[in-house]
């Protein structure tokens, strides 16, 4: 019986990384969900999560839409060949701030910890972080020589493809709420 030491290390560290990457980062969604309003002892965390999802997903959609329409300059073609600087700068940031602002306008009374300035700043902060999350998942897929992270959702690329950017933006929103609200 022989043990392939290199493969064993890869499997071990891959398992540890997978655990940390998914469970630790996604746990911030639970922290946001139960983020308490000090003045009323109420939980409005679901509104913050919806805000996060809108900003993050509008960022992804805006980058894709603008990048597809006018994108010419590839961001990092060896990692994610479809991403362009035009999509990132114009689509990602505009859609993230716009989506967040629209949601905040509708549910402002439930989001006691955020002001208009916070919403605009978070849109500008979370949009690039969402892109980093998407690129990080692309790096993982490239290293595994996989096009998609799974086959459960045909045409979308897998569940990890849906939550990759949220995994990175959730901790940032939680820390922002914790330290600045």
Over which residues does each language-model region extend?
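Membrane-embedded alpha-helical bundles of polytopic integral membrane proteins
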Residues: 1-125
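C-terminal halves and exits of single transmembrane alpha-helices
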Residues: 1-3, 166-172
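Acidic (Asp/Glu-rich) catalytic motifs at the cytosolic membrane interface
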Residues: 56-72, 76-77, 85-86, 128-169
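Juxtamembrane boundary at the C-terminal end of a transmembrane helix
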Residues: 174-181
């Amino acid at each position: 019986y022989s043990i392939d030491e290199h493969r064993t290390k890869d499997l071990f560290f891959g398992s540890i990384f997978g655990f940390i990457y998914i469970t630790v980062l996604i746990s911030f969604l639970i922290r946001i969900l139960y983020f308490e309003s000090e003045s009323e002892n109420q939980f409005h965390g679901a509104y913050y999560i919806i805000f996060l999802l809108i900003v993050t997903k509008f960022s992804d959609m805006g980058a894709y839409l603008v990048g597809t329409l006018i994108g010419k300059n590839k961001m990092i073609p060896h990692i994610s060949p479809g991403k362009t600087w035009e999509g990132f700068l114009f689509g990602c940031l505009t859609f993230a701030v716009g989506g967040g602002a629209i949601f905040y306008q509708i549910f402002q009374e439930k989001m006691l910890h955020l002001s208009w300035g916070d919403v605009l700043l978070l849109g500008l902060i979370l949009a690039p972080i969402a892109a980093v999350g998407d690129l990080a998942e692309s790096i993982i897929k490239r290293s595994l020589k996989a096009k998609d992270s799974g086959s459960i959702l045909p045409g979308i690329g897998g569940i990890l493809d849906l939550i990759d950017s949220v995994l990175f933006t959730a901790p940032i929103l939680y820390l922002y709420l914790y330290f600045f609200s």
